Swiss-Prot record:
Gene Ontology cellular-component annotations: DNA-directed RNA polymerase complex
Protein EC: 2.7.7.6
HAMAP family per UniProt: RNApol_bact_RpoY (MF_01553)
Subunit field text: RNAP is composed of a core of 2 alpha, a beta and a beta' subunit. The core is associated with a delta subunit, and at least one of epsilon or omega. When a sigma factor is associated with the core the holoenzyme is formed, which can initiate transcription.
InterPro entries, A to Z: RpoY
Gene3D superfamilies registered for this protein in UniProt: RNAP, epsilon subunit-like
Protein name (record): DNA-directed RNA polymerase subunit epsilon
GO molecular function: DNA binding; DNA-directed RNA polymerase activity
């Protein structure tokens, strides 16, 4: 499943909408997403699953590139 993650790059900063970044990640669950991103110390605001028509829209209208976490 593909997830869209809204995050701030620094855990210590107060979230500001204008500084929010997005990445797309393939994972089995929201918990799996958070586990994979844990080592980056991001301030994760929201994790959203992207499926069906929403996934097609993101592919056509957004810069949908799956992040590879090693």
């Amino acid at each position: 499943m593909i997830f869209k993650v809204f995050y701030q790059e620094k855990l210590t900063e107060v979230p500001v909408r204008e500084n929010t970044k997005v990445l797309y990640l393939e994972a089995t669950s929201e918990k799996d997403v958070r586990t994979k991103l844990n080592k980056f110390a991001y301030n994760i605001e929201f994790v959203q699953s992207v499926t069906g028509a929403h996934l097609e829209y993101e592919k056509e209208n957004a810069d949908l590139t799956l992040a590879e976490i090693v």
